[in-house]
Amino acid sequence: MSEIRIRRDVIFSGENPLVMLYRPGTDVPVAVASYWRCSFSAAGAGEALVIWIDPDASGLGDRSPIGIFTDNGAMAHLVWETFNRHFDRLQGHGIEQVTIAPARFTQQSDGMRLHRVACSFGVTTIELEWRNALDVFHTVTTPEVGGSQWEVSNVVCPCADAGIRVDGVPVIGEVHQPEGMYRSSAFLAFAESWVRIG
């Protein structure tokens, strides 16, 4: 019988897809969206979107959302303070200065072809869309984030294309691939668990 390894300091379990778009033909980011769908955390379940969009380069101007939108403020605070604020692409954009805003979420999926999340707050709707997954694989990594050591496991689908729309207006930007350990700047991440190991 194989040995069962038990780790108890589970901080987050759920989903954490990402979309990062670049100014076409460059390495300059114009939008970063980190979506969290939490099944378990010490702060409870819920959904959160941490997002930054460059108002000028994206073509959205004053429509560009910057901040954290959620249906569980405590959970959103947990993922921001513990994880997202240490991600260099989300630093220096004033996200930490914005009040966490209440939002509603819907999700639509069509296997490897399409995955869509809509985040609505007030009269505004942000849509994230991942298209044409290129692969599916399981990973286990042990990164250091925020001064803690973690074991992170997930099922990843790097995507060929992705987009962000705000009230139907698309961000002007493109996905880069290959990029990073997940081989695309837009990927789905399911069955994701963050366990503190040090």
Task: Write out the residue ranges for each language-model feature.
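Targeting-peptide/extracellular-domain and disordered-appendage signature
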Residues: 1-198
